[in-house]
């Protein structure tokens, strides 16, 4: 049970006064309540000092991989979505033991995705929407649950995590605890996602869209690597650009609904050529061994990873 501090509890009259248009339905929007700012949530659920130091160390180690200073591989690993904190903490604690065996060659980043994009908009949308899948959506409790889960997973494992930024405005609720952010296949063409990613201070993986178009993905990387001015959470902001924005190949879906992989040698060679045609910093690619690449057959992932590693031997670039 989560007990909110007093400042989060408003009377019905106070909430009514804070709502746009006096709480009336306007243009089919019903404004329910004002949510706490990221600063308020971060103050109430602060990152412990030792975790903050750990994140700095992990971020530096991960950056060295993207900039070419380190020969280690990044492995972002975990379930499709994270909705049960106990189960997630149990998983990352076991992953930490694996990390001890491979840390001289690999950097393991637990995949703790608290938002779940839906193809049609229907279905469970993740922890932020419904911290309790058996109850109605509660975004206040969802934001708190998201932050607490990320803090607790690091405390449990010593491994800072990755999350998908389905909603760019949620970034600052967890920007002091995450070490990697993914922009999904359905979001990568969206301008707000691209511009927000240009202000992230951790690597941002820009997935190819569901169509599989490499140019869309690379345009997204270009946008994220450059500075921008835009509106963000009610503020006029400037960003400096994210030099760690990179590509993620996750397979595609054709017009007949058939999944098409894009992890083969020919795909990687094409991506390398396209990278060389553009002035992008720290060219890098992460292969998503699931989704359309595996046709969602999880047992295929081991074979896919082995093939990708073999492809690297065929071309030193």
Regions found by a protein language model. Give the residues of each.
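Short hydrophobic alpha-helical segments enriched in small aliphatic residues
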Residues: 9-12
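N- or domain-start disorder-to-order transition segments that initiate the globular core
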Residues: 23, 28-67
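Metallocofactor- and cofactor-centric catalytic cores in central/energy metabolism, strongly enriched
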Residues: 49-63, 70, 80-92, 99-109, ...
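Acidic (Asp/Glu)-rich catalytic clusters
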Residues: 66-67, 96-103, 152-156, 239, ...
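Short, well-ordered coil/turn segments that N-cap beta-strands
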Residues: 70-73, 102-106, 157-159, 202, ...
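Conserved, mostly hydrophobic/aromatic
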Residues: 78, 287
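Active-site-facing alpha/beta catalytic cores
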Residues: 92, 105-270, 291-307
């Amino acid at each position: 049970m989560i007990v909110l501090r007093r400042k989060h509890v408003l009377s019905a009259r106070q909430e009514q006064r804070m709502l746009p248009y006096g709480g009336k339905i306007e243009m089919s929007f019903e404004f329910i309540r004002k949510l706490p700012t990221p600063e308020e949530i971060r103050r109430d659920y602060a990152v412990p000092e030792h975790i903050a130091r750990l994140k700095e160390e992990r971020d530096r180690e991960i950056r060295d991989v993207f900039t070419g200073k380190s020969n280690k591989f990044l492995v972002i690993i975990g379930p499709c979505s994270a909705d049960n904190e106990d189960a997630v903490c149990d998983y990352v604690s076991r992953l930490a033991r694996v990390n001890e065996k491979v840390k001289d060659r690999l950097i393991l980043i637990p995949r703790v995705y608290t938002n779940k994009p839906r193809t049609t908009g229907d279905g469970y949308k993740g922890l932020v929407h419904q911290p309790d899948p058996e109850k109605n959506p509660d975004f206040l409790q969802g934001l708190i649950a998201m932050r607490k889960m990320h803090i607790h997973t690091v405390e449990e494992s010593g491994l800072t995590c990755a999350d998908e930024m389905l909603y760019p405005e949620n970034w600052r609720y967890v920007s002091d605890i995450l070490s990697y952010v993914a922009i999904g296949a359905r979001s990568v063409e969206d301008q707000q996602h691209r511009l927000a990613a240009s202000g992230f201070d951790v690597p941002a993986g820009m997935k190819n869209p569901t169509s599989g178009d490499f140019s869309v993905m690379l345009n997204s990387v270009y946008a994220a690597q450059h500075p921008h001015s835009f509106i963000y959470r009610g503020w006029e902001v400037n960003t400096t650009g994210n030099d760690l924005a990179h590509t993620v190949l996750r397979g595609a879906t054709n017009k007949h609904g058939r999944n098409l992989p894009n992890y083969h040698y020919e795909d990687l060679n094409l991506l390398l050529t396209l990278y060389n045609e553009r002035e992008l910093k720290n060219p890098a690619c992460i292969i998503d061994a699931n989704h359309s690449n595996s046709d969602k057959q999880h047992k295929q992932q081991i074979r896919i990873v082995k093939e990708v590693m073999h492809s690297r031997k065929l071309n030193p670039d």
